């Protein structure tokens, strides 16, 4: 009974792995290059399935026809060695099949790898365990980025985007299946990836290369806006963060940020207590417009949650839980040298810090303003 159960269990695992109704589905492309990949892979999968069935049938036939009929039957089955027609047939047919697959594969790879003119250039940095996006709006990658954000790649619809995928620590792999294939993020190398989204929407992805304890939690997310909304997003995200009024909880939270957070995080327009610019270590996400994002912490947790009326409400409790003890929510390196450590913030410091962070707008268009902002 057990020997019968194990093959069934293995088959069930394979069938479950093939379910394509998740958000990360390569068979429902929403981008030009992803559609080209799907156009290539479907006939290849069909051809592979047909070949697999033919091989299985032939193997079954040989096993049945060539078996020994009795225990004392010493005769060998009929041998085909030296049969010129048979050997030419089973050599040429696989060669033609490989040619049938290779030609469109090579042409598709060359097509999706070409960089269109006037594409928006964005540097994509992978690091344990989140993605950073740096926008070069002028197209000159040698100049400082105009916009630096994290966790959400915001792009306009029907526009060519040139991604320069890189890593600041170990090897990662950037993948948003609805828009294109995967591209490894390798330290010291710049890997190009071209995307173009056909529809306004939000598309999920993830790191596809094992990169440490929280690899499974290293999400990627693309937010595709209309061209008008994208221009508004650009103008808003080019601005520095506003300074909170003196004597407010937000101002007290800014002081906590400078004392506890500014060695890793950056907020444009914020100076350290000594008057020097906050360290641009890039070890942690740029928080200048945190409230404009719908997710945080490796895009793992929602920063905004829908209420019964369909409006978005600030997820203050989740953000406070994250600040209270990050390693309790996401696996980090045991020596706290990777990921966000537990800073041992007091509850009063957490309240003040969140009061400041919720001022880092703008907020999503259908969101209810946080009570403290």
Give the location of each predicted region:
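Non-transmembrane, membrane-proximal soluble domains of secreted or membrane proteins
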Residues: 20-43, 63-263, 268-282, 297-336, ...
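C-terminal motif of bacterial Sec signal peptides marking the signal peptidase cleavage site
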Residues: 15-18
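Hydrophobic aliphatic residues
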Residues: 290-291, 323, 357
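Helix-loop element at the rim of GNAT/NAT acetyltransferase active sites that forms part
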Residues: 359-364
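Bacterial N-terminal signal peptides that target proteins for export
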Residues: 1-6
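Alpha-helical transmembrane segments
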Residues: 41-67
